[in-house]
Amino acid sequence: MPARIVCLSPYSKKQVEDLLTGRHAVEVVTVPDPPAPEAVLRECTLAELVIGDKRHAHRLPREVLQHMTRCLLIQMPAVGYDVIDDRAAAEFGIAVANAAGYNRDAVADWTVMAMLNLIRRGSWGDRRLREGGWPKAEMMGRELGALTVGIVGLGNVGLALATRLLAFGSRVLYADVVERSFAGVERVSFGDLLELADVVCVHVPLSGETHHLIDAEALARMREGAYLINASRGPVVDEKALVAALESRHLGGAGLDVFEQEPTPMDNPLRRMENVFFSPHVGGATLEAEARVLEVVRDNLTRVLDGDEPSNVVNGVRLGARLRSFTPSPRPSPAHAGEGDR
C-alpha cells in the first residue's frame, strides 16, 4: 500500500506530491479549512506521516494522538511545535520533528527592522507625513551601534541576530540556560540582562517554563525607556503587563510579531499605541525561508519512507522496530504506469 501522508498546513496536494518524487508510492490527503477537529481526527487516524499546521489552526492534542496508531512521524514545517502534545506523542511512539533554523535569517532580519523602526520612530513618522504633518523635531532617534542589546535565548535566531548587531557595533548580551561560545557576545544572568539592555529581544520556544517569562516583574526590571522585541511566541510575554508598562511610559516601545491570541482582538489596547510596531506573525515569512522549510519537510519524510530515522526530533522518540516494519509500496515505474488502461 502507498504511504498515507496527511497535510494540515496550507499546502496543496500537488505541492506535497511534487516534493516526494522518490521511489515510494504515497497518498496525500489535505484537511480543509476552516479548522475542523473531526476532520483532523478522521484523516490522521489512518496516516503514517503527518505534516503539522504551521498556522497553528489544526491542533494535535492527546485525544487525537491516541488514535493515530499507524503514525510514525509528525513533521512541523516550522520551528515551533506547541500545537502538538509532544509528550503524549512520545508515549504513543510517534516522533515529532521541527524545522529548526530554517527561518533564522528571516526572523533576525525582522528583529533588526523592528529595532530600527522603534529607535528612529519610522512608522510613526510615516503616518504623520501621510496625515499632512512634518514632524522633524519629534523624530530625533538613537543609533543602534550606541545601544546595548540583550538577547533572551541564543539559539539559531539569537546567533543570527547577534551577528547582525555586532556589525552595527552594538554591545550584545545574552541570557540562556546553555552557555554558547560566540566572539563578541557576553553571557549574563536573565535579571542582569533586563537591567542592562536598552533593547531586550526574546527568542525562546514556548513551554511551561517560558510562559509569561516576560511578566510585570521582568518588565519593571527593564531600564526606563527600554524597548522590548518579541518574535518568538505570544504567550512568552504577559500582554496585560506589557500594556501597563507602555501606558506608564516605563518602556519606550515594543516590537511585536506574535501575540497571546492570534489574530489579536480588535479591542487589544496594543493596537492603538503609537509606540508599538506590529506585524501579523510573519517574521519568518520570506521566499528563501519557505524554500528551506519545504526542503526540510521533503528530506525528513523521505528519510522515513526510506527506512531511516528522522532528524530534528524534538520529543526523543526513536522509531526503531516500528520503522523496520514499515514497508510502503514502491512507486510504479513510468513503463508500467497506465498499463491497466490499455
Residue ranges with predicted function:
Residues 157:
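Hydrophobic/small residue at the entry helix of a nucleotide-binding pocket
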Residues 58-60, 171, 177-269:
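Rossmann-like adenosine-cofactor binding region
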Residues 48-126:
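Phosphate/diphosphate ligand-binding glycine-rich loop within oxidoreductases
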Residues 151-152:
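Conserved N-terminal Rossmann-fold NAD(P)-binding element of oxidoreductases
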Residues 330, 337-341:
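A cross-taxon signal for low-complexity, glycine/charged-rich
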Residues 92-94, 99-148, 160-163, 167, ...:
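Phosphate-binding beta-alpha-beta segment of Rossmann-like dinucleotide-binding domains, i.e.
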Residues 96, 225-328:
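Rossmann-like dinucleotide-binding domain for NAD(H)/NADP(H)
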Residues 1-55, 169-173, 322, 326:
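N-terminal glycine-/charge-rich "phosphate-binding" loop or analogous flexible N-terminal tail
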